[in-house]
Every structure is written in structure tokens, then in C-alpha cells.
Amino acid sequence: MLINPILETLDKFDIAILRELQADGRLTNAELSTRVGLSAAPCWRRVRALEEGGYIKGYRAEIDRHKIGLGVLAFVRL
């Protein structure tokens, strides 16, 4: 079985942090630390390290396209 070498550098807490932030990028550090089983300071340091390491590239909002008048999304290839 092949193992992704990148995953070998991430431990269970890093993966849990990534999973939680992917599900809800607006979590406070206090809520995130509770969900992953760390205290606040180590959780904050890990998030910063994941950002600096390029694992977390940014935080985004999911926009309701219909509410802002952009009902159709089309990909066109010529």
C-alpha cells in the first residue's frame, strides 16, 4: 500500500484541524481546540504552522450565486 509522504508529516491533530477548518472555516480557536482535543495555545500554533507550511492556503466564503443575481454558472471551452 502506498502512503502519501505528505501525510506522514502531519499527525492526527493536524489532520483533525484541517478537517474541522474545511467543514467550517469560521471556527474560533477556542471551538477548534475543543473539537480536536487540544488546548487553545497549541491549537493556534498548529494552525499557524499549517498556514506557513502551505497546507492552509486561505479562508473563503461560499456565496449564494442566486441571491446576488448570478444564477447560471457555465464553463465554456473553445
Regions found by a protein language model. Give the residues of each.
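A compositional/biophysical signature of low hydrophobicity enriched in polar/charged and small residues
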Residues: M1-L78
